[in-house]
Amino acid sequence: MRIMGLDVGSKTVGVAISDPLGFTAQGLEIIPIHEEKGEFGLERLGELVKEYKVDKFVIGLPKNMNNTSGPRVEASQAYGQRIAELFGLPVDYQDERLTTVAAERMLVEQADISRSKRKKVIDKLAAQLILQNYLDRNF
């Protein structure tokens, strides 16, 4: 079963994919979006769904530290509903608290990547962490 992990932001969607057995997650790419213009990167997402024969989506939910939901949670759920209807695939959600922080820490401490380069990969790495956390908890 191939699962696609998504880190949905207001400007980009980080994309990760599981291996065919569902053991490991790998970051794929960052899709630019523009919420205000109604551009959600769905065409590119569709290309990736076909290329990787995706069976399911996992979307990170950016809950607050006190477990409450804010506007980004609602935006992520709306994105999930949109892609579920468009692609006819199930969508699960994964708590993503601190995944971007963890991704940034990994890039700084382990890879010593500059700030400008981090911006180019942070969402992809966050999507990978979201998906890997999901795989570790569910398979």
UniProtKB/Swiss-Prot annotation:
User: Where is this chain primarily localised?
Assistant: cytoplasm
In short, the EC number is 3.1.-.-
Q: What's in the keyword line of the UniProt record?
A: Cytoplasm, Hydrolase, Nuclease, Ribosome biogenesis
The Gene Ontology biological process annotation of the record reads: rRNA 5'-end processing
Cytoplasm as UniProt keyword: yes
Extract one GO cellular component term from the record.
Answer: cytosol
Query: Any stretches that span the bilayer, and where are they?
Result: none
User: Is-annotated flag, keyword Cytoplasm?
Assistant: yes
List, in alphabetical order, the Gene Ontology terms for molecular function in this entry.
nuclease activity
Protein localization: Cytoplasm
For this chain, the family text in UniProt reads: Belongs to the YqgF nuclease family.
What's its job? Could be a nuclease involved in processing of the 5'-end of pre-16S rRNA.
The protein, known as: Putative pre-16S rRNA nuclease
**Species the sequence originates in:** Streptococcus sanguinis (strain SK36)
